């Protein structure tokens, strides 16, 4: 990454903030979990306490509300689900252009793995991290790590 790319990434990162995150049952629309917290801080391992019933859902809708000072040409994210540090799943999401000085809501649906591939909550509890890397094109803006606890 050249110094121009790095300075652009620094400007975007300084003006980028997650305002809240919501997880819903994708079938009913009912809120399962909500947190009004900035999960975008890169040097912190965040924690989320999520109801165990989320593991029984066919699909989960994730809503991220974020604000940005700088515009982004192609906002996207790479999300990895890790169990004890090993990648179990990886998803790629692309939002596209994001205007400067805006607040945006991005909703995406994540379908559950087949039941035969699911592990019990007691095994997953505290051992799962979600690593989300936010990009503008190929420029990394920030990386968020959230450790999951099932309640």
Curated annotation (Swiss-Prot):
Subcellular location(s): the record lists:
Nucleus; Cytoplasm
Picking any one GO biological process from the record gives: sensory perception of light stimulus
Entry keywords, A to Z:
cGMP, Cytoplasm, Nucleus
- Alphabetical list of Gene3D superfamilies matching this protein: GMP phosphodiesterase, delta subunit
Q: Which cysteines are joined by disulfide bonds?
A: none
Report which superkingdom the organism of origin falls in.
Answer: Eukaryota
User: GO CC annotation: what is one?
Assistant: cytoplasm
**Family to which the UniProt record says this protein belongs:** Belongs to the PDE6D/unc-119 family.
What quaternary structure, including any partners, is listed in this protein's UniProt entry? Interacts with Pde6.
PANTHER family associated with the record: RETINAL ROD RHODOPSIN-SENSITIVE CGMP 3',5'-CYCLIC PHOSPHODIESTERASE DELTA-SUBUNIT, RETINAL ROD RHODOPSIN-SENSITIVE CGMP 3',5'-CYCLIC PHOSPHODIESTERASE SUBUNIT DELTA
Instruction: Specify the protein name.
Output: Probable cGMP 3',5'-cyclic phosphodiesterase subunit delta
Gene name for this UniProt entry: PrBP
């Amino acid at each position: 990454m050249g110094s121009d790319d790095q300075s652009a990434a620094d400007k975007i990162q300084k003006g980028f903030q997650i305002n809240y995150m919501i997880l819903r049952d994708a079938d009913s629309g009912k809120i399962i979990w909500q947190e009004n917290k900035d999960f975008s801080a890169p040097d912190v391992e965040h924690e989320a306490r999520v109801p165990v019933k989320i593991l029984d859902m066919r699909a989960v809708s994730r809503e991220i509300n974020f604000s940005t000072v700088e515009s982004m040409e192609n906002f996207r994210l790479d999300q990895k689900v890790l169990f004890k540090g090993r990648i179990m799943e990886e998803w790629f999401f692309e939002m596209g252009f994001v205007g400067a000085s805006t607040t945006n809501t991005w909703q995406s649906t994540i379908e559950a793995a087949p039941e035969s591939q699911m592990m019990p909550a007691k095994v997953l509890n505290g051992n799962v991290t979600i690593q989300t890397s936010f990009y503008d094109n190929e420029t990394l803006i920030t990386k968020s790590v959230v450790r999951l606890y099932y309640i």
